[in-house]
């Protein structure tokens, strides 16, 4: 079925539009068309904060002043019908796939996975993330900060890496794939390579590093 929104993935292979022949002079190559975001396509920035209640910030009437978030909300959209699970990985999986956390096998955090289908923490291939949808429609995609969607047994230095952020639709990943890390000596990765940018720096702080990297990339 044709998708009127143009975001169906994966894109089906199209028949060759050119002509071929035994003689070079009789061949007509097809014009190569690269996937690209449509003209005027907006930039998309999603910010997910752990351990923050819906009514905490002034953005939604809460007591904690958040002028920067208020500016973002004023220039963007406010959604107030999203189900959270009160724990990080299931909520993140729902946000990125647009599906119930049990449907995408993330019924609990990756450290507590078991063999039941809703709890094995292995996101099914048919549940594309918003990053994968955007990437296959011409966007450059990046994740900065906490990943926490990779099964624990795939977190080793030899991979496999297809369920790391770079395998879930993100061209660029800078952050930590686990549940938590130190703000001063973090377990940090650039793509899938472990790095230690804090070495030799007494002023290093992870939050500032993540923000700087994200801004530079954008």
PLM regions: where:
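Formylglycine-dependent sulfatase
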Residues: 1-218
């Amino acid at each position: 079925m044709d998708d009127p929104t143009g975001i169906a993935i994966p894109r089906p292979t199209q028949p060759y539009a050119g002509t071929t022949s035994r003689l070079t002079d009789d061949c007509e190559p097809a014009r190569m068309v690269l996937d690209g975001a449509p003209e005027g396509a907006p930039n998309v920035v999603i910010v997910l904060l752990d351990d923050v209640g819906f009514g905490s910030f002034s953005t939604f009437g809460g007591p904690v002043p958040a002028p920067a978030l208020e500016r973002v909300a004023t220039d963007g959209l406010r959604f107030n019908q999203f189900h959270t699970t009160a724990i990080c990985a299931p909520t993140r999986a729902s946000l990125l796939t647009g599906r119930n956390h049990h449907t995408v096998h993330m019924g609990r955090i990756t450290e507590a996975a078991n063999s039941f289908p809703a709890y094995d923490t292995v996101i099914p291939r048919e549940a594309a993330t918003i990053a994968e949808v955007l990437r296959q429609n011409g966007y450059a995609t990046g994740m900065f900060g906490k990943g926490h969607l990779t099964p624990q047994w795939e977190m080793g230095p030899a991979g496999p890496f297809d369920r790391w952020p770079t395998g879930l639709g993100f061209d660029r990943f800078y952050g930590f794939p686990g549940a938590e890390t130190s703000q001063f000596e973090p377990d940090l990765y650039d793509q899938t390579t472990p790095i230690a940018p804090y070495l030799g720096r007494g002023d290093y702080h992870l939050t500032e590093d993540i923000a700087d990297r994200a801004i530079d990339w954008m």
